[in-house]
């Protein structure tokens, strides 16, 4: 055992730091209580939400309305300009701009004088206050009503920036450190300095062609390295700044900004907080202008020569991101990755399944030295969604130019940039900007202007498919519910239910939905350019619906298949709404110039794979992430889990625990079952993570563990857990004094899931107590429906105030009065 002088405090502090971060709360409401674990939505709220019109229906309702011609500025924080519901609203100032602080609960309403009837788009200047890692969510109401369902879920992103390290570049054999420094300064790294024989400089705020060439030549990296030269993921921090949000669909199904119909005169605009605080600087109602097409854009810059610069932007060094979950990733699958190295961890890409949700974005900043037309080329990989192209919207922002100047941008440069396509392929690809066809797009860039390119996840052409499939799924689900109301979940296959006579509308609707799915399958094939497993899924469900809708005899025998396919369609819908894309780099290059290769030749690929195979025998995975060698004063921690979890834990140690305690941690990833032999050999760790709670006492009674209740902050830390979670980790000694030998890593908690559509259809409120749940059973059973009840006995025991163990854990407590009563209550639920 190492470091006995630091053993107890180190073990305790490390456990507390990690476990508090992982803590999940056990929430079981007592009988008859209505705590925060239950929904507060009433039946009327649920019906309003389910029956709300979509934006498509809202636009159809106001199809004859014209766009407004004037812009209206809302007085956001003037005296008497607004009314609030809730506490915490106040006027604040950020970066010289005054705004109204809105907390994460409550609502604020502004009264706006509109000069004319018409359609208005809305933009909000906001400042995301530092808080949790989640995005900001708001509900918009116009004249005290939510105008359409999509306005219930407005998501405003925060601004996150990685804390990159200074690059350290060693001079080559034929140059000195001073010569290398001079070259770095000439390239634009003006802060370059010589330290310990290396040239050190910070990551630039804006990449230029000269900087890009210098970085490629000298393999410049801005990540912290561990003792084995593996790159470590940088810390991402919120970097609040004033940002502009244009009200649009958070799901990404609708590419255009929302337009709201407002009548002339007084109107009320309300924002209701759902998640996270923010400060509102301004709200503007403005007439939405159509974005020019690429044809119009290219005519504007017709005759412009090609630019001369080439700037490679490594995606892992993005300037900013919308979420903390967007961080650099390692990919060693290809010899042409930039950079590629199989001997160590190199964080050379960004995205993947971390960059797949609508609204997520990353930004990269650059400048070119010569004006002209440029191709924006990306090297990417999309091997997740078979037969589905993923989509990104590209926004360009220019700094220092004003509207009307050549090369000025303040959003999407042309309409097609809202739906840039990245096709499916199992290999890496390189392509110019395109919308899924052979036609590519060029952009004009002004010289010496700082440009920021934002790539945002959107559904693009898949948005219409997703919206249609969602509507079809709703119809099919309603048809299924109508059938089981008559037949029950297990119908009699020998009975003639007479579906065509008893529910003709349902039979007709199944045929209608089959035709819609057939059309959607053709549409999906056209988008992807080929048939896929997803197309086959839609066609299969369409055939099933057509059979059931046209023949009564096929309904009962296919009912279970219909239920299964409803789930399959839901899975397809979920997959189609994700847009994963792994990005290696973006290259700004002269229009028409040769694109870089996407994949290596045979010899390059063979050498890359053989080198990786050979290195796998010698790579030290245990020390990955360690910033210093193990010593007698370090704490040895064993972790029995996956490697990605060990990396997360190593980041917590490096960024939080060690800097705050000055205690080194030797983290080792081990296989399960290694603890027992190590203890027998007297070579066990100081801390072990991943031990089953049932094994803790087995080790404790054999004096293999130390008790932890003697630490000053034990009571405060243990209070974060339920008594039941701590009971299994402790035992009494001969003097009947309770000792504890560990802390829970995770806690489970029961949850109740309800079908809001079913409850609304049957006019049932969401049950909040067991009595209310019991009251729902007759109505459900009358419609051949049931409640899926839990068989977890402990929740009934705890809700009655009982304990699982008696006599301080020495015997089971199931034979007590409260234990028997709890068991009886659970059993009674299955006899109704």
PLM features per residue range, with description:
Residues 1-42:
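Gram-positive cell-envelope targeting signals
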Residues 30-564, 568-574, 578-583:
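Extracytoplasmic
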Residues 270-271, 686-690, 788:
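Paired acidic/hydrophobic, glycine-rich loop segments that form the ligand-binding mouth/hinge
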Residues 291, 666-670, 709-712, 729-832:
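Helix-loop-helix "hinge/cap" segment bordering the ligand-binding cleft or interdomain interface
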Residues 591-633:
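Disordered inhibitory propeptide/activation segment of secreted metzincin zinc metalloprotease zymogens
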Residues 616-636, 736-737, 760, 778-785:
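Immediate post-signal peptide segment of exported/extracytoplasmic ligand-binding proteins
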Residues 630-643, 657, 663-668, 687, ...:
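Short, well-ordered beta-strand elements
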Residues 655-724, 757-765:
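Extracytoplasmic "Venus flytrap"/periplasmic binding protein-like
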């Amino acid at each position: 055992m190492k470091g006995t002088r630091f053993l107890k405090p180190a073990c305790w502090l490390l456990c507390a730091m990690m476990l508090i971060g992982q803590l999940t709360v056990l929430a079981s409401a007592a009988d008859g209580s209505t705590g925060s674990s239950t929904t507060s939505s009433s039946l009327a709220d649920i019906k309003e939400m389910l029956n709300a019109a979509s934006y498509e229906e809202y636009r159809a309702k106001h199809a004859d309305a014209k766009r407004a011609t004037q812009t209206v500025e809302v007085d956001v924080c003037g005296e008497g300009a607004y009314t609030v519901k809730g506490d915490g609203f106040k006027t604040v100032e950020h970066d010289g701009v005054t705004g109204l602080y809105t907390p994460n609960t409550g609502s604020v309403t502004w009264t706006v004088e509109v000069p004319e009837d018409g359609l208005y788009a809305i933009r909000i200047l906001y400042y995301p206050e530092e808080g949790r890692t989640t995005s900001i969510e708001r509900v918009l109401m116009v004249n005290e009503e939510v105008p359409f369902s999509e306005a219930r879920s407005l998501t405003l992103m925060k601004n996150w920036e990685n804390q990159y390290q200074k690059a350290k570049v060693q001079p080559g054999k034929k140059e000195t450190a001073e010569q290398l420094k001079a070259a770095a300064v000439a390239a634009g790294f003006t802060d370059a300095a010589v330290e310990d024989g290396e040239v050190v400089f910070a990551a630039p705020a804006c990449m230029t062609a000269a900087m890009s060439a210098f970085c490629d030549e000298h393999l410049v990296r801005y990540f912290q390295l561990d003792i084995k030269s593996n790159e470590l993921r940088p810390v991402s921090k919120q970097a609040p700044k004033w940002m502009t949000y244009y009200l649009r669909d958070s799901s990404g199904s609708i590419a255009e900004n929302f337009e709201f119909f407002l009548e002339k005169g007084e109107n009320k605009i309300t924002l209701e907080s759902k998640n996270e605080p923010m400060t509102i600087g301004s709200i503007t109602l403005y007439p939405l202008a159509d974005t020019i097409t690429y044809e119009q854009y290219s005519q504007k810059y017709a005759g412009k020569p090609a630019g001369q610069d080439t700037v490679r932007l490594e995606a892992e060094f993005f300037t900013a991101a919308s979420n903390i979950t967007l961080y650099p990733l390692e990919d060693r699958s290809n010899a042409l990755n930039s950079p590629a190295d199989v001997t160590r961890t190199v964080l050379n890409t960004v995205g993947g399944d971390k960059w797949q949700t609508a609204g997520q974005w990353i930004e990269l900043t650059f400048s070119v030295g010569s004006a002209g037309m440029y191709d924006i080329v990306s090297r990417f990989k999309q091997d997740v969604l078979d037969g589905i192209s993923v989509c990104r919207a590209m926004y360009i922002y220019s700094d220092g130019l004003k509207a009307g100047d050549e090369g000025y941008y303040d959003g999407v440069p042309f309409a097609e940039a809202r739906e840039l396509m990245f096709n499916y392929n199992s290999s890496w690809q390189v392509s110019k900007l395109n919308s899924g066809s052979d036609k590519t797009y060029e952009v004009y860039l002004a010289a010496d202007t700082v440009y920021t390119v934002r790539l945002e996840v959107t559904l693009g052409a898949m948005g219409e498919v997703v919206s249609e499939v969602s509507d079809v799924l709703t119809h099919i689900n309603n048809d299924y519910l109508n059938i089981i109301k008559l037949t029950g979940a297990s119908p009699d296959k020998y009975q003639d239910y007479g579906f065509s006579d008893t529910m003709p509308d349902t039979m007709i609707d199944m045929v209608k939905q089959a035709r819609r799915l057939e059309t959607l399958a053709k549409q999906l094939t056209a988008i992807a350019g080929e048939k896929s497993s997803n197309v086959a899924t839609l066609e299969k469900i369409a055939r099933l619906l057509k059979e059931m809708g046209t023949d009564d005899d096929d309904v009962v025998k296919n009912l279970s298949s219909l239920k299964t396919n409803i789930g399959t369609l839901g899975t397809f819908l979920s997959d189609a709404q994700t847009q994963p894309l792994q990005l290696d780099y973006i290259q700004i290059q002269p229009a028409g110039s040769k694109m870089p290769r996407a994949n290596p030749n045979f010899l390059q690929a063979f050498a890359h794979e053989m080198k990786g195979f050979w290195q796998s025998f010698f790579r030290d995975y245990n020390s990955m992430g360690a910033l210093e060698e193990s010593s007698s004063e370090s704490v040895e921690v064993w972790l029995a889990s996956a490697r990605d979890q060990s990396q997360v834990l190593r980041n917590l140690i490096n960024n939080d625990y060690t800097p705050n305690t000055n205690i080194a941690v030797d983290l080792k990833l081990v296989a399960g079952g290694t603890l027992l032999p190590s203890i027998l050999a007297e070579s066990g760790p100081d801390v072990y993570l991943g031990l089953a709670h049932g094994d803790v006492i087995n080790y404790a009674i054999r004096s293999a563990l130390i008790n932890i209740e003697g630490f000053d902050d034990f009571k405060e830390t243990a209070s974060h857990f339920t008594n039941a979670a701590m009971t299994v980790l402790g035992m009494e000694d001969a003097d009947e004094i309770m000792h504890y030998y560990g802390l829970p890593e995770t806690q489970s908690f029961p949850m109740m899931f309800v079908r809001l559509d079913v409850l609304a259809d049957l006019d049932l409120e969401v049950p909040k107590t067991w009595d209310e749940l019991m009251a729902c059973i007759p109505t459900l059973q009358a419609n051949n429906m049931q409640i899926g009840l839990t068989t977890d006995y402990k929740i009934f025991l705890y809700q009655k105030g009982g304990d699982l163990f008696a006599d301080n854990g020495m015997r089971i407590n199931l034979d007590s009065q409260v234990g028997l009563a709890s068991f009886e209550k659970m059993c009674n639920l299955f006899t109704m």
